[in-house]
Every structure is written in structure tokens, then in C-alpha cells.
Amino acid sequence: NQDIKVWNISLGSMEEVPRNSISPEAALLDKLQQKYDVLFVVAGTNQENGEPTYLGSPADSINALVVNAVNRNNKPASYTRRGPVLSFHHKPDLAYYGGESNDPIIACCGTGAYPAVGTSFAAPLIARKAAYLIYKMHLSCELAKALLIDAACAWTTPEDMDRLGYGIVPVKIEQILETSNDEIRFMLSGVATERDNYNFNIPIPVSGASYPSVARATLCYFPKCNRNQGVDYTDTELDLHFGRIGNDGRIKSLLPNNQGEEDCTTDEEKARKKLRKWDNVKHIAEPLTSRSKPKKVYANPMWGIM
């Protein structure tokens, strides 16, 4: 049913996924998401008695929103399994409350309230939030995924990404949709075609001769994939540059990035490790600390996204 945009999958294999290849089940989910414009929210799978350690299929789906569990103290649940998948892709994407055996969450079943524990119960709560963003706020699947990741990460540096992904999603939907009084959010969505560049200029408030602000950006997209290519599984790469526009017309990205420029000296290893090349989720941000300083304004006061 193509009218259903969000599908929850609260099941998974007890076996670990291979380190350098995608599972058949995850590859099928990736194909369906890219082809039919749907979003699968997948439980991060559970471990029993400390094993296995790594995620089980289909939680290695690249396009899916993979959810691990935390306890009420915002720490990884005792049964949480870990990423990455395909050697370097960040999975899980997010974490949410899944309870512990001595402190379960309450789920609803056919006979009423039921004390529950597991990533299988955390994932549906995120699926509900994703469905609200898509059906009620009319966001695309990719934009809904990006917004959830951005809300989880916020201005913090992700910790323990192998088990918590980009962070814990806020409980209230208002915390995902709304910004504080000192924040501005821009959301861009569209369809990219092969070998094209897309440039956007964004007006950022200026105070005197500087920008008294910090910034962050989150990019999500659903690429075509090929399971026969091993760790080179994704066929599509979208590069992200976001920052001030210098006097030379180039974007001074928050994360220095000269890919695509004539003087590019970035090798493949660095591009993957530092710039997340071939990863379909990219998050770049400036740290928000007491030492954050205003930034110089160039001749063009706009910021650029490319």
C-alpha cells in the first residue's frame, strides 16, 4: 500500500550482520524506500546475556531509521547492540526509551497495559513521531528523518554513536518542530539529478561586522544501492558544504571541504572518515560553548549551502 509512508519493523536476527556487506533483508528495505518513497523505522535488535554485540538484520538498512534503546537515565539499555555497519556507516541512527527488566516501559496489547522491554518497543514510538511529521506536517520522508536526527543531536557532540547514533530524540513533538527564541531553522527538500550542483543563499542576522551565532546542518537522502558492491554499497553521493561565502566566492564550510574543487587534495580514506563520503546522513556543526566567538562577515553577507 503506497499510501502508507511509515512502516515499523520490530523484529530482527539474533545473528550479527557481516562487517563488510549488507544483509539481503536490509538491501530489500533500501530498495523499497528509494523506489516507493517510504520510510522504514527499524528496531536496533537486542542482545541476550551480552551476545551478540553487533546489530542484527535488518537493522543494517542504510535508508531506514534504525532505533536503539536507552533507559530512563538516558544511558544505553543493557541489551543494546552496536554499529557501525558496512565498515563505517553510523547505525543506529537514533535512540529512544525502551525500558529495562527492572524498570520497563508500559505498552498496550490486546488485554490492556503490558510492561515491555526492548528496541522493539522504542522503534514504534519513533515511527509515531515520523508519521506525525510526514502526515500532519507534510514533510518528505527524508526531511522527517533529517529533522529527527537534528533534534536528537541538537548542539551536543554525539557520544557513543555506535550504540546511541546521533542521540536521544526529544519526548515532545514540539521540541522537534519548534526552535527556541534565539534559533532560526531552514528546511530544504528536493530531488537531485546526476552530476548537478545545487546552491542556496541564506540570509543570516549580522551584528556590526560579525555573525554572533553558531550553526549546524543535517542532510539525509535515500540513494540507490547495489549489494554486489560490498562496502561501496551506495551508488549516489551528495556532498554538503555549509558556511559563510568568502570574498573568493567559495563557501567556507563549517567542516573544511574542498571536494569537487580543482585544488582538491582529499583522498578517499579521508573523504570517508572526515567528510562521510558515501554516507547518506551527514551532520556538520559548530560547537556551542562558552568560548564560542562571533565570526567575520565578508563582502557577501549571505551564507551558502551547496
Question: What residue ranges belong to the model's regions?
Answer:
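Substrate-binding/access-modulating region of protease and related hydrolase catalytic domains
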Residues: 1-57, 115-117, 121-122
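Acidic, glycine-rich active-site loops and adjacent beta-strand->loop/helix elements
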Residues: 13, 44-48, 70-71, 100, ...
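C-terminal subdomain of the subtilisin-like protease fold in secreted/lumenal serine endopeptidases
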Residues: 135-212
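Extended low-complexity, serine/threonine- and proline-enriched intrinsically disordered segments
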Residues: 214-278
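Subtilisin-like serine protease catalytic core
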Residues: 1, 35-37, 61-63, 85-91, ...
